[in-house]
C-alpha cells in the first residue's frame, strides 16, 4: 500500500472514531509556528517564532527575508512543539499546514516541511486555509462554540464578514473593496512615525488622545456589508502632511485616537448590521486586528446592547499561530478532506 492509499485509510478511521491529535504548521507570513491540537479544541502545545526584529528595520515584511527565516526556524519550532507535548512525531494522528493565502515563498516552506513530516510518519496531510484558521481560533478559546454564527475577520491582508453555516462551510456577507483593515492601521502608524509593527503601537497611542479631535470620512460602499478603508487612510495622510507643510505640530495621540475610532466604528457597524439582519445569535472576532482594544471594547458594548453573544480569542490567538490551524484541520479531517504529496502553496486562496 502506497503513502496516499494508507493516508486515506487512516483518515477514514479517524473520521469514524471522531477524534484526532494533529500537528499543525503555520508559515504564511512572518511567524513560524507549530502546535499540537486535540479534537479541534484542546491545545497540547504551541510554539511561535516571530520575525519582527528581522523586518523592523525595513518598516514591513520583506518576503525573501521571511522565507529564509522560515527555513531556519521550521524544524526547531516543530521539535520544540513535540518536546513541550512530550510526544514523538509517530504519536500524532495527522499533520496539517497552512497552504494559503499568504506570501508564496513563506507558504512553500511550511508546505514542504509538512509534506516531509507526513510522509516520514506515514500520516494523513490536511491542507488549511489561513483565513479559516483565524475563524477557528474561536473554537480553541470558546470550546462550547458551535455554528452557526457571524464572524468578522480583520487582519493585515483580509477584512471579511462571513456567516459560519457549519464547520468549514461559509457564506461571504461582506469584504473590503480596497485596503484591508490591518493594512490601513499599519499605514496610519507609519505616517505618524511609529515603528513596525505599527498597529499595536497605534492602539496604545490612541488611548492617550481625543477620538473626536479629527473628523474622518465614513466611506459608503455598494455592498451593504462591504468595507472601504482607502478614503479613511488618504484623509489621515493628507491631514498629517498639511500640518507638517504648515509647520504645525502633529498631535499624534489625537490623530491616532481619531483614526482608530473611525476605523473601529466602520468595522463594528457593518459587522453588527450583518449580524442583526441575518438573525445571528453569536458574533465572533478573528484576525490580528481583533486584538485591537478599541475594536474589542466597542464590539462588546454593541453586542451587549443588541443581546448578541460576542466571542473573541485572546490576543495571542488573534495573531498568526498554529493552534488555530490545528483546530481548522480537525474539522476538515472529519469531513475526509486530506491532501496528497502534490499539495502546493496557493498565495491567493479564497475562503469562499
Residue ranges and their predicted role:
Residues 17-91, 97-101, 130, 134, ...:
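N-terminal beta-alpha supersecondary unit
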Residues 127-128, 299-324:
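Conserved phosphate-binding/catalytic loops in two-lobed NTP-binding clefts
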Amino acid at each position: 500500500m502506497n503513502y496516499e492509499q494508507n493516508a486515506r485509510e487512516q483518515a477514514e478511521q479517524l473520521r469514524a472514531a471522531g477524534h484526532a491529535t494533529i500537528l499543525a504548521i503555520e508559515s504564511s507570513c512572518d511567524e513560524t509556528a507549530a502546535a499540537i491540537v486535540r479534537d479541534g479544541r484542546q491545545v497540547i502545545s504551541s510554539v511561535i517564532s516571530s520575525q519582527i526584529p528581522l523586518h523592523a528595520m525595513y518598516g514591513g515584511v520583506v518576503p525573501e527575508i521571511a522565507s529564509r527565516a522560515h527555513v531556519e526556524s521550521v524544524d526547531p519550532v516543530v521539535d520544540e512543539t513535540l518536546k513541550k507535548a512530550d510526544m514523538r512525531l509517530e504519536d500524532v494522528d495527522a499533520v496539517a499546514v497552512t497552504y494559503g493565502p499568504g506570501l508564496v515563498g513563506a507558504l512553500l516552506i511550511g508546505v514542504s516541511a509538512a509534506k516531509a513530516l507526513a510522509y516520514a510518519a506515514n500520516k494523513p496531510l490536511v491542507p488549511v486555509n489561513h483565513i479559516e484558521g483565524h475563524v477557528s481560533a474561536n473554537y480553541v478559546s470558546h470550546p462550547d462554540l458551535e455554528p452557526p454564527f457571524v464572524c468578522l475577520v480583520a487582519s493585515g491582508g483580509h477584512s471579511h464578514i462571513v456567516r459560519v453555516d457549519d464547520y468549514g462551510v461559509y457564506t461571504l456577507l461582506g469584504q473590503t473593496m480596497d485596503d484591508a483593515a490591518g493594512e490601513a492601521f499599519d499605514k496610519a502608524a507609519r505616517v505618524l512615525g511609529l515603528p513596525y509593527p505599527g498597529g499595536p503601537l497605534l492602539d496604545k497611542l490612541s488611548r492617550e488622545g481625543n477620538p473626536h479631535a479629527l473628523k474622518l470620512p465614513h466611506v459608503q460602499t455598494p455592498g451593504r456589508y462591504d468595507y472601504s478603508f482607502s478614503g479613511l487612510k488618504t484623509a489621515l495622510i493628507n491631514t498629517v502632511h498639511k500640518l507638517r507643510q504648515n509647520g504645525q505640530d502633529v498631535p499624534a495621540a489625537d490623530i491616532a485616537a481619531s483614526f482608530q475610532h473611525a476605523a473601529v466604528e466602520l468595522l463594528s457597524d457593518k459587522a453588527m448590521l450583518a449580524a442583526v439582519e441575518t438573525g445571528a445569535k453569536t458574533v465572533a472576532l478573528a484576525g490580528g486586528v481583533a486584538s485591537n482594544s478599541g475594536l474589542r471594547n466597542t464590539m462588546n458594548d454593541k453586542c451587549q446592547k443588541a443581546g448578541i453573544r460576542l466571542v473573541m480569542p485572546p490576543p495571542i490567538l488573534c495573531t498568526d499561530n498554529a493552534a488555530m490551524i490545528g483546530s481548522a484541520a480537525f474539522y476538515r479531517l472529519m469531513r475526509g478532506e486530506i491532501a496528497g504529496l502534490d499539495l502546493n502553496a496557493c498565495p491567493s486562496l479564497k475562503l469562499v
